Amino acid sequence: MTTDTIVAQATAPGRGGVGIIRISGDKASDVAMAVLGHLPKTRYADYCDFKSASGQVIDQGIALFFKGPNSFTGEDVLELQGHGGQIVLDMLIKRVMEVGGIRIAKPGEFSEQAFMNDKLDLTQAEAIADLIDATSEQAAKSALQSLQGEFSKEVHELVDQVTNLRLYVEAAIDFPDEEVDFLSDGKIANALYKIIDKLDLVQASAKQGSIIREGMKVVIAGRPNAGKSSLLNALAGKESAIVTEIAGTTRDVLREHIHLDGMPLHIIDTAGLRDTNDTVEQIGIERAWNEINSADRVLFMVDGTTTAAVDPHTIWPDFVDRLPSNLGVTVIRNKADLTGEDLMMTEEQGYSVYRISAKTGLGVEELKQHLKSLMGYQSNLEGGFIARRRHLEALELAAGHLQLGKEQLEVYLAGELLAEELRMCQLALSEITGRFTSDDLLGKIFSSFCIGK
């Protein structure tokens, strides 16, 4: 942990109405004495001159001093809030550096100091960057929930439950001569099942939070001339893709990034899937499958004039069999303007089926509502937390250890192995909040922050 005093511009570079210089560390009070001529009263706004070493006024503004540990970073912090001209701010930083023993902060270093001083955990620190980078109202709300500790609370509860169960299992191992067989009395199994159920709920919320942050990737797939490019244009609200009556017009991947009521959506239009000897088309089809395999959702586009079937296993079994087992599929029966089908949604064999006309726009609004629902629009209006991919990976790892532990208990009654899986689960969960996290990971996380944060 560094003990350096650091300085950086806390406001965005460039011209603005107000510019803020932030100093954190033991020398913050020395900077105040050198630049202001006095140490401001803690937590009081002090309007004063910011002076050079020769006594000339560089700027005028408000100085705020926070005595550690009662500050954002947990250290002494001085903020100089002056006019937002970049030249003035650069002069002020240069003046601060003249005090000696002070260096320019690295990206995210103020937040890193706050984390190191237990002022916030890692998910809260990440939420600061996510709040700054939010591209929608929903992302901002979710990031604020994480910043206020909602995600951390869920993870801490899981860690506590896993730790308590682990202690109970280890106690059962240490006292094998007791009359009660702790490993088979049902208490351990019931506690384990409750933890698994709780983790499933947190995983579901985290996945929604990740979609809010990163967007949901939706791939439009199907046979040539089913109307995939027309649907891309309808969802994007503009002519992004060339549409013709010639099958196989789209030979490469087309992407559009849109927002549905603040929810980010990445729409991928792909080449029509079919057997072909055309080398260029074969490459496009291979790329289409690459996109499908990494999608969050597939819109299976069907030309409604060619079949009355609604079950994808009936329409194209080979296509369905090749899809990843955990990939959600929505069936889109297109060209409803020609088939005369009612624009309704039905559930068929576990699949949502929509009838639309991508050409005329009929049914597209209902499809948008469906996509919003998949992204958790309503739940995020009510309040959710934001999550990153590393959080999802850690939760998945923890879930895997719980499932292995369940097997050790149910099949083998192996208490030692169950305890070890619980320990590994505990470590995976603790990495989310930063309780047990490598320095390399911390460096990677904080280096992505803005300078001055």
From Swiss-Prot:
Q: What PANTHER family does the entry give?
A: TRNA MODIFICATION GTPASE GTPBP3, TRNA MODIFICATION GTPASE GTPBP3, MITOCHONDRIAL
Q: Which residues bind K(+)?
A: N225, T244, I246, T249
Q: Where is the TrmE-type G domain?
A: 215-376
Q: Which residues bind GTP?
A: 225-230, 244-250, 269-272, 334-337
* Gene Ontology, cellular component aspect: cytosol
Record's function text: Exhibits a very high intrinsic GTPase hydrolysis rate. Involved in the addition of a carboxymethylaminomethyl (cmnm) group at the wobble position (U34) of certain tRNAs, forming tRNA-cmnm(5)s(2)U34.
Q: Which Gene3D superfamilies match?
A: P-loop containing nucleotide triphosphate hydrolases, Probable tRNA modification gtpase trme, domain 1, tRNA modification GTPase MnmE domain 2
Localization, per the record, is: Cytoplasm
Alphabetized PROSITE patterns for the sequence: G_TRME (PS51709)
Locate the residues binding (6S)-5-formyl-5,6,7,8-tetrahydrofolate.
Answer: R22, E79, K119, K453
GO MF term set: GTP binding; GTPase activity; metal ion binding
Concerning its family, UniProt says:
Belongs to the TRAFAC class TrmE-Era-EngA-EngB-Septin-like GTPase superfamily. TrmE GTPase family.
Keywords tagged on the record: Cytoplasm, GTP-binding, Hydrolase, Magnesium, Metal-binding, Nucleotide-binding, Potassium, tRNA processing
Q: Which cofactor does it need?
A: K(+)
Q: What does the entry list as the binding residues for Mg(2+)?
A: S229, T250
Q: State the protein's name.
A: tRNA modification GTPase MnmE
What's the Enzyme Commission number for this chain? 3.6.-.-
Paste the cofactor note.
Answer: Binds 1 potassium ion per subunit.
Species assigned in the record: Shewanella baltica (strain OS195)
Q: What is the predominant subcellular site recorded for this chain?
A: cytoplasm
InterPro entries in the cross-refs? G_TrmE (IPR031168), GTP-bd (IPR006073), GTP-bd_TrmE_N (IPR018948), GTPase_MnmE (IPR004520), MnmE_dom2 (IPR027368), MnmE_helical (IPR025867), P-loop_NTPase (IPR027417), Small_GTP-bd (IPR005225)
Q: How does it assemble?
A: Homodimer. Heterotetramer of two MnmE and two MnmG subunits.
| GO BP | tRNA methylation; tRNA wobble uridine modification
Which Pfam families does UniProt cross-reference here?
MMR_HSR1 (PF01926), MnmE_helical (PF12631), TrmE_N (PF10396)
